[in-house]
């Protein structure tokens, strides 16, 4: 059985769905969000868990034979950065403790494309040295720390770490008003968000594709690396989305960096299934009967 923490969030739920499609049993943890999406209803085991509770976390191993862990649970920063770091670091350490205690095969953990911030190269590849630079958000700062904490914590344990440098993900279950990605606002609105231009864009991946990539990295017979970029592998522009929707955007804009996924494809065979048109059609159909 594979454990997905934060398994009812957008990325976690699509990861669980993809693992089910590969024939695996899945247990997901839920804390703040407890609504089970229709595509998981009755198909996964749901455990209510505050990942900062070490005893409760380790007790999962007494109820389930867990073979692998995908750690995606995380909190949203408030006014106190130390409180945010304490919460998410405690959850990470408890997940790592569980991985070592249970002797799981593989431990996959969420990092971010934001760790590359400051590199001028396009696209971003895993072999680039991560720069020392001011970071735009507390979440990215924590994700940058997650990487060495995970690999060093699991060194010599027999548990294989898999660091997931996750790109810009959108799709079913995304926050419709996400401050990190204007795509949902563009697709959901009759008029485009202000200050959005045809040439604006960068990295993007549709959530079902992202979940499938994580599932493949979690279950692949062998992996040649411990760090993988996770996205569609191609840049996008908001002009592409606007064209699909018949919306006009003003010209201009800046196309931001995107992730190279050659390593992911080489080790798992992953290729995205959704282009811009297919993702918009799938998302709009989903939103007909779902609030997010």
What is the predicted role of each segment?
Residues 138, 142-145:
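Active-site helix of classical SDR
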Residues 94-138:
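Conserved Rossmann-fold NAD(P)-dependent oxidoreductase catalytic core, especially the SDR/UDP-sugar
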Residues 63, 79-108:
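NAD(P)-cofactor binding segment of oxidoreductase domains
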Residues 195-292:
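C-terminal substrate-binding subdomain of Rossmann-fold SDR/epimerase-dehydratase oxidoreductases
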Residues 2-22:
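N-terminal Rossmann NAD(P)H-binding glycine-rich loop of SDR-like oxidoreductase domains
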């Amino acid at each position: 059985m594979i454990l997905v923490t934060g398994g009812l969030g957008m990325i976690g739920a699509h990861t669980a769905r993809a693992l089910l499609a590969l024939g695996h049993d899945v247990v997901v943890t839920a804390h703040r969000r407890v609504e089970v999406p229709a595509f998981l209803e009755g198909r996964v085991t749901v455990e209510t868990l505050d990942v900062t509770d070490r005893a409760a976390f380790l007790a999962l191993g007494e109820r389930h034979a867990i073979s692998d862990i995908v750690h995606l649970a995380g909190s949203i920063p408030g006014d106190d950065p130390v409180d945010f770091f304490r919460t998410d670091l405690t959850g990470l350490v408890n997940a790592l403790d569980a991985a070592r205690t249970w002797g799981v095969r593989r431990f996959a953990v969420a990092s971010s494309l934001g760790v590359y911030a400051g590199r001028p190269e396009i696209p971003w590849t895993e072999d680039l040295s991560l720069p020392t630079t001011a970071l735009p958000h507390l979440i990215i700062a924590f994700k940058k720390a997650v990487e060495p904490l995970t690999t060093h914590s699991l060194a010599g344990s027999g548990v294989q770490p898999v660091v997931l440098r996750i790109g810009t993900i959108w799709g079913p279950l995304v926050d419709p008003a996400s401050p990190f990605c204007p795509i949902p606002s563009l697709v959901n609105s009759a008029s485009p968000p202000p200050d959005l231009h045809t040439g604006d864009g960068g990295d993007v991946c549709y959530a079902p594709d992202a979940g499938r990539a994580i599932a493949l990295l979690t279950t692949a017979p062998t992996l040649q690396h411990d760090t993988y970029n996770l996205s569609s592998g191609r840049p996008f522009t908001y002009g592409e989305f606007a064209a699909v929707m018949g919306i006009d955007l003003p010209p201009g804009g800046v196309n931001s960096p995107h992730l190279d996924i050659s390593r992911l494809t080489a080790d798992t065979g992953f290729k995205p299934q959704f282009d811009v048109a297919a993702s918009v059609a799938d998302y709009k159909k989903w939103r007909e009967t779902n609030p997010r």
